């Protein structure tokens, strides 16, 4: 059994880090700081300026439990219950994929088009397929006040999380949700269809990092036998929901650029752009109809 955690902030941070080092956590200093700050309500500045600051017993107990969860492999943002994405704080739930920085590449890929369309037409209607936390749609809405978005997900729990995030960010008036298996219950036409679909081949799910495999919902990971099923569905069905001038943007696995491009071209789309993520991997493809 671990020794009791110190009550003073500075020693508490050091002990939290030591526990995570011992557990083999990848970034123990950062995760320890995030956990201590979140559950104690303190800041990094306070830790530097007042390391002897006393932390109350309830916070100590919460930190102790959180460190145990992190040492057991649970991702730190699952423990905190939120993650930052494109400068927005998004709540997480068991039904949602944890949004990651690579997906910000998709936001950047379509943002100029969304801005231009909103400036010209007075609005830009966005459809976010598999919305999860609402990350993609809400990032675009936060950047373009004239835009509106519909978040689609098969999971009612994910949609509840996305709607809650929209409300907390003051974007609820421009964000609606539809529970649907892809386009099944979608109506209307959109200037942008965006998706970060499941793209992991079924056979590879077991080889994912523990933090992904054990805590992200399988529904948001499994793209079928070859990982390409969602792209086939989107390419086959999207055209009837698109405005005459429009874009489709999809996140892809880093080895899938050619295969996904071929799927969309075979369905009548033209390639507009291919973007890499911060790690230099192929990550986002943008298409237009015709």
Curated annotation (Swiss-Prot):
EC numbers for this chain: 2.1.1.297
Gene3D superfamilies the UniProt entry points to: DNA helicase RuvA subunit, C-terminal domain (1.10.8.10), Vaccinia Virus protein VP39 (3.40.50.150)
Residues involved in substrate binding: 196-199
Main function: Methylates the class 1 translation termination release factors RF1/PrfA and RF2/PrfB on the glutamine residue of the universally conserved GGQ motif.
BP-aspect Gene Ontology terms: methylation
Catalytic activity: L-glutaminyl-[peptide chain release factor] + S-adenosyl-L-methionine = N(5)-methyl-L-glutaminyl-[peptide chain release factor] + S-adenosyl-L-homocysteine + H(+)
Family stated for the protein in its record: Belongs to the protein N5-glutamine methyltransferase family. PrmC subfamily.
Protein name: Release factor glutamine methyltransferase
Gene Ontology MF terms in the entry: nucleic acid binding; protein-(glutamine-N5) methyltransferase activity; protein-glutamine N-methyltransferase activity
Source organism (scientific name): Mesorhizobium japonicum (strain LMG 29417 / CECT 9101 / MAFF 303099) (Mesorhizobium loti (strain MAFF 303099))
Sites where the protein binds S-adenosyl-L-methionine: 130-134, 153, 182, 196
HAMAP family: RF_methyltr_PrmC
Pfam families, A to Z: MTS, PrmC_N
Keywords: Methyltransferase, S-adenosyl-L-methionine, Transferase
């Amino acid at each position: 059994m671990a020794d009791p955690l110190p009550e003073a902030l500075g020693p508490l941070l050091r002990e939290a880090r030591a526990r995570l080092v011992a557990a083999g956590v990848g970034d123990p200093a950062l995760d320890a700081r995030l956990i201590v700050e979140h559950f104690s309500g303190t800041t990094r500045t306070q830790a530097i300026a007042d390391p002897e600051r006393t932390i109350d017993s309830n916070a100590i107990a919460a930190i102790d439990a959180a460190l145990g969860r992190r040492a057991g492999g649970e991702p730190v943002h699952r423990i905190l219950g939120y993650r930052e994405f494109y400068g927005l704080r998004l709540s997480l739930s068991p039904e949602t994929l944890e949004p990651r920085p690579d997906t910000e590449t998709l936001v950047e890929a379509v943002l100029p088009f969304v801005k231009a369309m909103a400036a010209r037409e007075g609005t830009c209607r966005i459809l976010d397929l598999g919305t999860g936390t609402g990350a993609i749609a809400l990032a675009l809405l936060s950047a373009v006040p004239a835009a509106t978005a519909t978040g689609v997900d098969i999971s009612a729990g994910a949609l509840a999380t996305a709607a809650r995030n929209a409300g907390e960010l003051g974007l609820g008036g421009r964000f609606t949700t539809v529970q649907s298996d892809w386009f099944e219950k979608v109506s209307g036409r959109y200037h942008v269809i965006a998706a970060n679909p499941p793209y992991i081949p079924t056979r590879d799910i077991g080889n994912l990092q523990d933090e992904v495999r054990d805590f992200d919902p399988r529904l948001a990971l499994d793209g079928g036998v070859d990982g390409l099923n969602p792209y086939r569905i989107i390419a086959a069905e999207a055209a009837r929901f698109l405005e005459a001038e429009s874009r489709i943007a999809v996140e892809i696995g880093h080895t899938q650029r050619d295969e996904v491009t071929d799927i969309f071209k075979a369905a009548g789309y033209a390639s507009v752009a291919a973007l890499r993520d911060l790690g230099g991997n192929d990550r986002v493809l943008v298409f237009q109809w015709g």
